[in-house]
Amino acid sequence: MDLLDWNRTEEEQAEGLRLARQVKAFNVFLQPCDKRNNKNVWDNCALIVSEKEDAILEPYLPYLFAWIQDLNWPGAWCIFERLQEYKKEGMYDFGWQEIYACAQALEDEVWMENLKMVRHT
């Protein structure tokens, strides 16, 4: 994970991405938050996640919808674009509705708008 840090050189980050692509349990790349790795790795984590196929991403849709709560967060636009490519049927709709209800409960207007934008594109 340390090699995905945006403070590393481009070469080190490229090596980090190469190694990360080999990780099978990619859920570790869903907005990690610990002492050393948090927003500083999210851009590269989003790249890894966005490369996955729809079927692999399906169980993690709520986490992806949560990532676009604030499009200023590192990696959020990458995830937004990946969600736009996702086939909007079945679990996508269920996950979207679940997270939209959460955004409504929080009265988070920005998040609700982001969710509407990603669904209607």
Q: Which stretches of residues belong to each language-model region?
A:
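Amphipathic alpha-helical scaffolding segments comprising HEAT/armadillo-like alpha-solenoid repeats
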Residues: M1-D2, V23-D34, D54-W67, K88-Y100
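Terminal domain-start segments
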Residues: M1-V41
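Structural detector for internal amphipathic alpha-helices that build alpha-solenoid repeat scaffolds
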Residues: E10-Q22, W42-A55, A66-D70, P74-Y86, ...
